[in-house]
Amino acid sequence: MKAFKQKQVWFITGSQDLYGPKVLEQVAKNSEQIVHGFNESSAISIEVVYKPTVKSPREIHAVCQAANSDENCVGVILWMHTFSPAKMWIAGLNELSKPFMHLHTQFNAELPWSEINMNYMNTHQSAHGCREFGFIGTRMRKERKVVVGHWQSSDVQAQIDDWCRAAAGWHESQNLRIARFGDNMRQVAVTEGDKVAAQIQFGYEVHAYSLGELNEAIAAIAEGDVTAQLDRYASEYQVGNELFGDEYQLDRLRKEAKIELGLTQFLTQGGFGAFTNCFENLTGMTGLPGLATQRLMANGFGYGGEGDWKTAAMVRIMKVMGQGRAGGTSFMEDYTYNFGATDQVLGAHMLEVCPSIAAAKPRLEVHRHTIGVRCDVPRLLFTGKAGPAINVSTIDLGNRFRIILNELDTVTPPQDLPNLPVASALWEPRPNLAVAAAAWIHAGGAHHSAYSQAITTDQIVDFAEMAGAELVIIDADTKIREFKNELRQNSVYYGLARGL
């Protein structure tokens, strides 16, 4: 079973009528076998759909139009089995609005040395057919992924899957709706941004709603549904006897369950995939949602605190991209440092860290929330599982959006955190905290990020290229002088590219 149900990537092979019916039959047969191999492979998480070989400008244009209008198609893989004169592709590529990958492969891995003849050479021409196609992509300035190697190679299939996941994320971005309850935290700069520009570039819509509308949805939840929700909490988390045995704590938990159910209903009925709220805008609420927000994220919704709609969007997009993979994705904040032999960052937030990143079964507890509405709020407590991760931040620079990515190594805390009443993750940024933090600050990265152990750097690279967005990467090879020069060069490139 593929991780992405209903979503598809189309496999389109290019050729021409020059070769005659026998060669074209072989081209079609080989293409079908490749598609079958991809669909049988556990390495590729999305269904690949075979499309008949295209041999003329009219056929190419028609299949590109069909891909555009098919809601289930998130992108296309293009392969030139033989030589397919690239002028035939101009109208189709001009029409194509879905992302495309150029797969530079051939059907047979090895040459049949003792049998090879000109019939074989004319049938298996990817080596120069794909170069012809590559030229027209470059000439038309088309952004695309190029994957090179034999189609059965595990490395090639991993690259294909990375791109397919990015294409699924881009498809989600094009259809995503984000609900904002309240506004940004007052006087905060980085969570602001141009929502119209974001919709033009990324596709997602951001809509504001009053707390009154949300409170109506919460008030409409039946008490029987609240009781059933408490039963779910008891079965899914570590819950101390004192919580259900204490009348006051139980009341706070019932209120939180009601918030979760009301929020879920509001978002689902409105077709929203992500939401934001702010601790400064809680009129009529019993508190800042804690457990409710954590569970909504665990169920796939994106979230951004303090009105941070850009991070909410990225959390949702990355959750879609990571479907079926180990690890999780969460809203996150760089909170405090541990300077020592190896400098570390303790990431957390006031309440809202997703349990999909938890190292062990979370504990459900009620603690005092001291910012905004000061009250006792149920929340899940845990530490993040150890392993490689990334932090991704999207910022608005005025004339463009920039995505900043830092590769991390999440580690197990050396000691317990018995007095910390929020979920957290401890990580060591690559190459180290001194370089990573300086680079992040030079790039303008936010204090919020989308943290993930399910998504790879390559997938974010593919996504950023689909979006036409600037991406800067902080990893083990980062050096500050080179990084600052990259930022300067990017400023020139993206400034000129808008007018070219």
UniProtKB/Swiss-Prot annotation:
The gene is araA. Belongs to the arabinose isomerase family. One of its GO terms (molecular function) is L-arabinose isomerase activity. GO terms for biological process: L-arabinose catabolic process to xylulose 5-phosphate. HAMAP family: Arabinose_Isome (MF_00519). The keyword Isomerase applies. InterPro entries: Ara_Isoase_C, AraA_central, AraA_N, AraA_N_sf, Fuc/Ara_isomerase_C, Fucose_isomerase_N/cen_sf, Lara_isomerase. NCBIfam families: PRK02929.1. Mn(2+) binds at E306, E333, H349, H448. This is L-arabinose isomerase. It comes from Shewanella sp. (strain MR-7). Its EC number is 5.3.1.4. Keywords: Arabinose catabolism, Carbohydrate metabolism, Isomerase, Manganese, Metal-binding. Its cofactor is Mn(2+). It holds the Pfam family AraA_central. Binds 1 Mn(2+) ion per subunit. GO terms for cellular component: cytosol. Catalyzes the conversion of L-arabinose to L-ribulose. It catalyses: beta-L-arabinopyranose = L-ribulose. The keyword Metal-binding applies. Pathway: Carbohydrate degradation; L-arabinose degradation via L-ribulose; D-xylulose 5-phosphate from L-arabinose (bacterial route): step 1/3.
